[in-house]
Structure formats: structure tokens, C-alpha cells
Design a protein with these regions (language model features):
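A helix-centric hydrophobic-segment signal that preferentially recognizes long
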Residues: 2-183
Length: 183
């Protein structure tokens, strides 16, 4: 009889532990979704700013129409992979706008264009901060998922490692080609 009671208590404690770990993993997933929404908000704001930059640039560079049709309509991504693609697409359009603007000095000196460039810089900082938060949350759940015994619960619940938001490499250069001669 004591063995049966002991077994029931053990199974009950095991079930409570399993539910507790499962709930903790679910909370991590919710936290990741919440922090990813911040990234989506920044991407929408950034999209709107890029659209405004395109309007200003169109006024100066009417014959550069092919550039202006490349703005991808994606404003936010449902998954982390889609968000990475949206960020890449927006960065590509920004690079094209900057390339076109170099051909039009009057565009570069436009107060509206300069204000939009500053706004993009601010939004890039907001995006970087939001990405750090998402990646920190992703790191927490991924560490939990690969740690025993939580990995058992994650496996049973079908929870897999979550991908990180990609770090931007655009604008980062190899320093080996710099001239270090001080003379």
C-alpha cells in the first residue's frame, strides 16, 4: 500500500514538474513573440520612412524609375526568417536610394531628405535594440531546450530551437584594405 501511495506521489510530482517546465517554455515563446512585435513595429515605421525617402528622391530623379519600383511591400514578417528577409529588403532599397542620391547633390542637401536620413538612423538604432532583445529571449529558450531535463519536455511538446534575428553585416567592412600609413 505504501508503495502504491509512493508511486502515486512520484507520478504526481513528475506531472507537476512536466507541466511546470512546459509552462516555462511556453512563457519563453510568448516573450519572444512579444519582443518580435517590437521589431515589427520598427520595421513598419522604417518602411514608412523609406517610402517618404522614395517620394522625395522621385522628385529629384524622375528617370531612375526602376529603383522606385523595387520597394518591397513587406512591412513586417510573421516569422523570424521573414523578418530577416524584410530587413534585408529594406536595407537593399536604402542602399539603392543612397546610391541614387549621390548623383543628385541637391537631393542630399534637401532638408526633408536630411531629416528622413536622420529618422532612418534613429530607426536603425531602435531596430538594433529590438533585435538584441529578441535574440536575448531566443537565447534563453534555446538554452532551456538543449538542457536536460527540459529537453525532454521540449521534445514531447514539439518545441524546437528558435532561429536568431540576423545581425546586419551591411556596412561592415574588412579592415585589411585600409591604409595604416600615418606619413
Amino acid at each position: 500500500m505504501n508503495l502504491i501511495i509512493g508511486l502515486i506521489i512520484f507520478v504526481g510530482l513528475l506531472a507537476i514538474w512536466f507541466i511546470s517546465v512546459g509552462n516555462r517554455l511556453n512563457r519563453y515563446l510568448v516573450t519572444i513573440e512579444e519582443s518580435k512585435r517590437t521589431v515589427d513595429i520598427v520595421l513598419v515605421k522604417r518602411y514608412d520612412t523609406i517610402s517618404e525617402m522614395l517620394k522625395v528622391a522621385k522628385a529629384y530623379a524622375k528617370h531612375e524609375q526602376d529603383l522606385f519600383t523595387d520597394l518591397v511591400a513587406l512591412r513586417q514578417g510573421a516569422t523570424i526568417q521573414e523578418s530577416n528577409q524584410v530587413i534585408t529588403n529594406q536595407n537593399d532599397v536604402l542602399a539603392q536610394i543612397r546610391a541614387v542620391s549621390e548623383n543628385y547633390p541637391e537631393l542630399l542637401s534637401s532638408n526633408q531628405f536630411l531629416a528622413l536620413q536622420k529618422e532612418i538612423a534613429d530607426e536603425n538604432e531602435d531596430l538594433a535594440a529590438a533585435k538584441r532583445i529578441v535574440n536575448s529571449n531566443v537565447s534563453h529558450i534555446n538554452q532551456e531546450i538543449v538542457s536536460f531535463p527540459a529537453s525532454i519536455v521540449a521534445g514531447v511538446k514539439g518545441i524546437h530551437q528558435v532561429p536568431f534575428l540576423a545581425e546586419e553585416t551591411q556596412g561592415k567592412k574588412d579592415l585589411s584594405d585600409l591604409n595604416y600609413d600615418l606619413n
